[in-house]
A protein has these predicted regions:
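Short, well-ordered secondary-structure micro-motifs
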Residues: 21-22, 64-65, 94-97
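Short, hydrophobic alpha-helical segments
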Residues: 153-158
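Glycine-rich phosphate-binding loop used to anchor ATP phosphates in small-molecule kinases
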Residues: 33-85
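Short, hinge-like loop/turn segments at secondary-structure boundaries
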Residues: 26-30, 71-72, 100-103
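Conserved substrate/cofactor phosphate-moiety recognition/catalytic segment
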Residues: 2-46
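Small-molecule kinase domains that catalyze NTP-dependent phosphoryl transfer to phosphate-bearing small molecules
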Residues: 95, 99-148, 160-162
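Conserved phosphate-donor/acceptor-positioning beta-strand/loop module used by diverse small-molecule
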Residues: 75-98, 135
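Conserved nucleotide-binding/hydrolysis micro-motifs of P-loop NTPases
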Residues: 15-16, 59-60, 87-92
Length: 162
């Protein structure tokens, strides 16, 4: 089996799907529920020492307050936040996007949606207020990306130790 970090993965779309099952997307109650779910998971994972990967598409600068709040929440209970920006060639991104696995788990899988979001927001910039690792994963397997992240941030992982 490919090496893994052993970290739990909390995909952004999971909180969205949960809230959307009850509230219309974009409404105030929807936003409040998404927010409560995310921050409850962040805080409890950090408090309990559960290593967590949270995935989302960062829109600069609109999402900076969210990132700062995540960091404050996690660090406030003794956790650590390691920001990672994954990038790849636009052609490769567009080729990967329609993969059935992405749609199956609720991730963005539409080229039209990507183009709309990229036209409306800056989704290719790093978070300006925090250190972050940028990894070009154009030619890398997920396990290789994980190893780079673990080594860069000196994260505990038996499978990646020197």
């Amino acid at each position: 089996p490919p090496p893994t970090t052993g970290f739990k993965v909390f995909h952004n779309h999971v909180s969205i799907a949960c809230a959307e099952s009850v509230f219309d997307f974009g409404t105030k109650p929807f936003g409040r529920v998404v927010d409560k779910i995310r921050f409850a998971v962040f805080e409890e994972a950090a408090r309990e020492g559960v290593s967590l990967v949270f995935t989302f598409v960062y829109a600069c600068p609109e999402d900076t307050p969210f990132v700062e709040r995540v960091c404050e929440t996690v660090e406030g209970v003794g956790g650590r936040v390691c920001l990672v920006r994954l990038v790849c060639d636009r052609e490769v991104l567009e080729r990967r996007l329609p993969h059935p696995e992405r749609a199956r788990v609720g991730k963005m899988a539409s080229l039209d949606m990507l183009r709309e979001v990229a036209g409306r927001y800056d989704i290719f910039s790093p978070v300006p207020t925090r250190e972050s690792l940028s990894v070009d994963n154009t030619a890398l397997a997920p396990a290789e990306v994980a190893e780079l992240i673990v080594r860069h941030y000196h994260l505990p992982s038996a499978e990646f130790k020197d």
